[in-house]
From Swiss-Prot:
Family: Belongs to the DNA mismatch repair MutL/HexB family.
Protein's name in the database: DNA mismatch repair protein MutL
PROSITE patterns assigned: DNA_MISMATCH_REPAIR_1 (PS00058)
Compositional bias annotation for Basic and acidic residues: 407-421
Gene name, Swiss-Prot/TrEMBL: mutL
HAMAP family reported in the protein's UniProt record: DNA_mis_repair
Amino acid sequence: MGRIRKLDDLLANKIAAGEVVERPASVVKELVENAIDAHSTVINIELEEAGMAKIRVIDNGDGMEEDDCLLAFERHATSKIHDEHDLFRIRTLGFRGEALPSIASVSEVELTTGTGSGPGTKLVLQGGALVSRERAAGRKGTDITVSNLFFNTPARLKYMKTIHTELGHAADVVNRLALAHPDVSFRLRHQGKTLLATNGSGDVRHVLAAIYGAETARQMIPIEAESLDFTIRGYISPPDVTRASRNYISLVVNGRYVRSVPLMKAIEAGYHTLLPIGRYPIVFLSIEMDPVLVDVNVHPAKLEVRFSKEAELNELVTDAIRQAFRKRTLIPSVSADSKMAKPKAEQAAWTFTHRVREPSVLSSDIGGGEDATAPLAPLTGDAPAERPSAAVQTDECGILDEHGPAFERKQEEEVGEERCSPRLPTDGQAEDKAAADRLPPLYPIGQLHGTYILAENEHGLYMIDQHAAQERINYEYFREKLGEATKEVQELLVPLMFEYPADEYERIAACRDELARCGVFLEPFGPRAFLVRSHPTWFPKGREREIIEEMIEQVLAAKTVDIKQLREQAAILMSCKRAIKANQHLRQDELFALLEALRQTTDPFTCPHGRPIIVHFSTYEIEKLFKRVM
């Protein structure tokens, strides 16, 4: 008798549940996605003990007929695809027909559903076996409760985390589904306490406000981009609004929230040099494309996807983020922690008039160049002390209506106060700013501790980190100077020797041509060593060995060398080494030239490491600190 036998359905479902149902959050995801596929507009999720004790999902969707109820718990039974061609044009969130039987096999399930055109149906299942079947009220929609998860697989229970951790995973799933479907009203409750409530208005900003708070939602910057194959829309946080992990980046493809490492890298490339190391933005991107261009049938959980034109999509995402930042002045503003008050009637408006000192030619090299020492025209203007404190109408989430009169009044009130946390932009703000216009003219008035430059204009006071400012100036200079990899090489007086184990030596020897194309020529020297007698001229002095070792490591790991990345690292290194340091006092003309050189850079707001360069104290905020407005 043969040893191979067919598994019974219950055992097969338990095995499938190992991939589909990893934790309570997996059940929440599958049930809510079914509700969305059923065209629900209101979905309520109730959890007890983070879903381990009970998960209940109630929707007002299409519901099911009695016969469909029974088939729904059969393996590979689905209403969402019919033949193999449908696999390449999937528009629904579910399609595999595995979720419900897998969930039912490791829990107790009670399902009540109806189409609204007759009596409903109620099913009770335990461990995948049907316990009871009866008629129920004919309410349109579905009410499904999953209890005692993993009751018959105690080994799985051992791997569950704390209630707090499991609840966090479940809430994260609902948050991302709510972002992906802003036209659906979601309500998530745990032990009777509401954790999330969205209004289903279709405005993603309202969902962002419900998840991250109204203040964060107000600061989010809208982005959009389009190509022949892709349409991208979403919101990104300014560089000063960051988090400690990538968990706040939400990606949605054709209404399905997904995970994609290449897209994550494309987003981070868009923020390049704008974020400090270890900090990540808040991002929501919705990407629409022909279903033929994306494969969602990679894993039973349907979170990982593959794109047919991945490089094109990544480039579009990166460019969209960069374009959004090029349209804005990203100077953080410092505000006084006090309620906005109306100025006293006797407080007169003051006038800003600055007499420009024509700077002399610099004796020290601060990277300004001739343009930085050109005299500037005097800047005069009136900056009223009074800032109206009239209430501004907002919607229920605390977000200004960008098309209403209240938003226009608010914009008028803030003329002259360019902020890093912009209000929701109007369509007229889509014009690109020239590099120098992104940073207003600044007039130095001194230094603080020989480290920070104090400058002024009609908008208030500015503090500039002089080291970070020249880092940015130097970085853009060296990045352009290095250019493309050159064939010019610098001969070494003393050759560099690199030794490797025998296995790595053979792999490196096989990739010598790749390194030679980059200007690094490896000469075999003995059984396990190479000599390098020259290097490209763009290598920073004193860092030759380190860069060559990194190039060899890239060859070992990826069989290729990313010259662009190496040049980028070299530019950052040289910009930092050659920048003025803290506690270095500068003359007035040197301060002036440094600020003008900073204005000419393409990104004058952060250093190459992502740290802020400049902070703004508005005139109004300063007057509040001194109680000149009461």
